[in-house]
């Protein structure tokens, strides 16, 4: 029973917020490379369930983007997002931070 409480405390319901630049990046991937677009959706789903572990090698960012996290979309491109207690802000899905 104690284990159940720990699990429920770790998983929080957060609202996913998609910033305009992120939506534009997703549109780009749908038009240019649907395979990468599908991977982006997998990373969004994984990041929404557990923002700090899972697929895409999640890592905390430093310096100007301290507090943000990234997941590897391709060798060159990353999904960047901010996590708070109540929401996950998806900021970009192209380029590196």
Give residue spans per PLM region.
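Short interaction-prone segments
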Residues: 65-67
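Solvent-exposed, amphipathic alpha-helical segments
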Residues: 43-46
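Enriched for short, Lys/Arg-rich terminal
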Residues: 1-15, 24-41, 55, 61, ...
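Blade/loop signatures of beta-propeller domains
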Residues: 49-50
